[in-house]
Amino acid sequence: LVGSEMCIRDRIWNSQVWINGTKVEGFNESLTTPHYFNLSKYLVPGENNKIVIRIDNRRQHDISVKNLAHAYTNDTQTMWNGILGKIALTAKDKVQIEELRLTPDIDNQTVNVSVKIGSNGSSPVSGKLLFAVKDPKGNKLADKEVQVNNTEITFTYPINNPMLWDEFTPNIYEATATLETEGMTDSKCEIFGMRKLTNQNALLQINNRRLFLRGTLECCIFPLKGYPPMDEAGWEKVFSAARDYGMNHLRFHS
């Protein structure tokens, strides 16, 4: 077991973890993003390991006026107890792709690629990264190979004559980054759309055309459970209903 990572999603405020009675270094404190813990130094391979998680949803910081912060009130169904969503324990190689970030540039017909590599070892990371893209029709574009000698890699990938994304033609590209280093292989896949969001004289533009926002506020609308969906199917229902009513965006308090 070279590396292990725990991901805790959909919990409120402060989390800490113990493995076999030993506290894992650090703690996570956020209201909206997943909490991650590196357990590599604490788990014993081949043995039963006891994992204890403590969630503290008490007010950690005063972020509101008259208790009206929408990220932490009973009025918006955001003061949850414990963990509502996903808990995952993932075994990882010593070297792996931590983040693949894609930023489209339709003016130059490119996508700017940023790759962050994580390593549990002390030696420098070296190897190669293979970057591949499929267009919205499923056609494979030219591969790009990049030499790896650092934990952060940035490069530009050409998207000639891109099929642009908007709400009426939601063209989606699929990118895959594959890291080969030290006899190990790791891959990460992300989707992206070629689009540009700007403003012109305080008017929103998408791909140099006027954009009209038609949306609603989703807030405290789950009375049976008291919290938003914790699975993909639940969110598909929410977004599909909004789309069927002609909306193109949602705003959330919960």
Language model features with spans:
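Conserved aromatic beta-strand anchor motif in extracellular beta-sandwich/beta-rich domains
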Residues: V17-G21, L129-D135, L179
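Accessory beta-strand-rich segments of carbohydrate-active enzymes
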Residues: S4-E5, R9-Q96, N120, H249-H253
